[in-house]
Amino acid sequence: MGSSEAETPAKANKASAPQEQQPPATSSTATPTVYPDWTSFQGYPPIPPHGFFPSPVVSNPQGHPYMWGPQPMMPPYGTPPYVIYPPGGIYAHPSMRPGAHPFAPYTMTSPNGNPDAAGTTITAATAGGETNGKSSEGKEKSPIKRSKGSLGSLNMITGKNCVEHGKTSGASANGTISQSGESGSESSSEGSEANSQNDSQHKESGQEQDGDVRSSQNGVSPSPSQAQLKQTLAIMQMPSSGPVPGPTTNLNIGMDYWANTASSSPALHGKVTPTAIPGAVAPTEPWMQDERELKRQKRKQSNRDSARRSRLRKQAECEELAQRAEVLKQENASLKDEVSRIRKEYDELLSKNSSLKDNVGDKQHKTDEAGLDNKLQHSGDDSQKDTN
């Protein structure tokens, strides 16, 4: 940060005059903690810290060479040595609070209710007649300029506001002050002194001009229009507008095309009336209700059709069974008639057979008797011949 002193141009004379009159005061920023026994944990020459993490105190955050040194091509045999960690961890600097740089993952709350990634508290600017933040010329937005100091110093981002007669603007987030002039930036040492003077003057004046000039977290002094954007707004749930309304349809479409129009069609029954339900939007469009009614009617019609088909199928089956029963009855009657006829014929045959048997028996008896008579006659004749 000391290299930025040589590259920044000189300040304006009008801007330096009020700075010299202000008495120095104690800075409100926290003093970084320096560990006195830091060298006892590290026996290696110090290396400049990484440029991404700026630090006002030159510290040696490097760890043990077994962690940061080059790895050998072949791992050594045996148990590797114990890795030594410096106090506070490798990446945690003792001189920086959580969220002390703009890209920190820790967010700190600011007075206006918005999370402040830089982790700093917004302070008021100089009080009294030196501050003219309410002037019309000071309402323009100031460009963000990055200081040309150290490589990773992101805390030196300062802003320039259009102020009349070389008067100072608000303090930046990291404790520096942007002043109006030719370049609009100054060195870090003079900025810290001006910050201490502004802090002491702010303590004396109180909070009378707290809302006049404020510095943002990136070092840009915002205009009143920007301050309005930082106000916390309540999140309101926007009601959904619903689907795009379409043409009104009903069940009579195509039925009364030549007789009635869509406006003269009868109203559908069973429409759902829109009710005030919290957290939901009632369907107030008529075409949505018509579509639901149409679907309901289609469902009912399909149910009726299926019931009618099943009823017709059962009726057809019953008719077929009745026809078959009639046919079977006729066949049964014809079979009964035939059986009765056959039985009559059988009876007739039995009677004829019995009559024939009787006739045959009579004739045979007569023949037997005639033959017996003949035998008797022959036997009588033979006996007479023998006696003679």
UniProtKB/Swiss-Prot annotation:
PROSITE patterns, sorted: BZIP (PS50217), BZIP_BASIC (PS00036)
Annotated stretches, region: Leucine-zipper: 321-356
InterPro entries, alphabetized: bZIP (IPR004827), bZIP_plant_GBF1 (IPR045314), bZIP_sf (IPR046347), GBF-like (IPR044827), MFMR (IPR012900)
Plastid in keyword set: no
Biased composition (Basic and acidic residues): 302-316, 359-369, 375-388
Disulphide-bonded residues: none
Record domain bZIP: where: 293-356
Induction pattern: Induced during incompatible interaction with the fungal pathogen Puccinia striiformis. Induced by abscisic acid (ABA), ethylene, cold stress, salt stress and wounding.
Expression by tissue: Highly expressed in roots and at lower levels in stems and leaves.
Keyword Glycoprotein assigned: no
Compositional bias ranges of the Polar residues kind: 169-179, 214-231
GO biological process, one term: regulation of DNA-templated transcription
Keywords: DNA-binding, Nucleus, Plant defense, Stress response, Transcription, Transcription regulation
Annotated protein name in UniProt: bZIP transcription factor 1-B
Organism: Triticum aestivum (Wheat)
Gene of this entry: BZIP1-B
